[in-house]
Amino acid sequence: MDSSSSSSAAGLGSVDPQLQHFIEVETQKQRFQQLVHQMTELCWEKCMDKPGPKLDSRAEACFVNCVERFIDTSQFILNRLEQTQKSKPVFSESLSD
């Protein structure tokens, strides 16, 4: 999601909560699709030497490993961001008081 999309979504405070939820869900779907596209491109470049009629065992193992490492790394980053976010004081709450 780019900054214009996030600023548009942030300005939806007066919009119907169902619409806001729908937009959030669609944004999450878009992020997931972008992630899958990035993973596919990365693993394809890394694992496919010469496309052929069949996937050889080396390429198959490479794809499996690539996807697993990508998922592990993504999960690690998400967990780290979550920990960082929990440890920082929430400025928006303190500003509204």
From Swiss-Prot:
It is found in: Mitochondrion inner membrane. A motif (Twin CX3C motif) lies at residues 43-66. The gene is TIMM8A. It comes from Bos taurus (Bovine). Mitochondrial intermembrane chaperone that participates in the import and insertion of some multi-pass transmembrane proteins into the mitochondrial inner membrane. Also required for the transfer of beta-barrel precursors from the TOM complex to the sorting and assembly machinery (SAM complex) of the outer membrane. Acts as a chaperone-like protein that protects the hydrophobic precursors from aggregation and guide them through the mitochondrial intermembrane space. Belongs to the small Tim family. GO terms for cellular component: mitochondrial inner membrane; mitochondrial intermembrane space protein transporter complex. Gene3D superfamilies: Mitochondrial import inner membrane translocase subunit tim13 like domains. This is Mitochondrial import inner membrane translocase subunit Tim8 A. Heterohexamer; composed of 3 copies of TIMM8A and 3 copies of TIMM13, named soluble 70 kDa complex. Associates with the TIM22 complex, whose core is composed of TIMM22. It is a peripheral membrane protein. Disulfide bonds join 43-66, 47-62.
